């Protein structure tokens, strides 16, 4: 099992996504969500995107997810 503080992204089909151990939401629109993680940034593109459930550690995103990309922190 993964350590509890390591960021984790789980995509379920084309319409649901679980983001664990995120730091903050940088940008939120119904077609684009940008999330700061410990080791980089996750960008989600699609349409009708909704942050369905949110806790201080976990986030569930629903909608039509078209693409997800990751920008790794460069040190």
Show the residue positions of the predicted features.
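N-terminal intrinsically disordered, cationic/polar leader segments
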Residues: 1-75
């Amino acid at each position: 099992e993964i350590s509890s503080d390591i960021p984790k992204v789980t995509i379920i089909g084309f319409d649901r996504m679980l983001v664990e151990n995120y730091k903050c939401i940088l940008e939120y629109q119904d077609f684009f969500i940008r999330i700061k993680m410990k080791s980089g940034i996750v960008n989600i593109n699609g349409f009708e995107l909704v942050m369905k459930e949110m806790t201080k550690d976990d986030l569930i995103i629903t909608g039509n997810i078209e693409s997800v990309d990751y920008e790794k922190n460069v040190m």
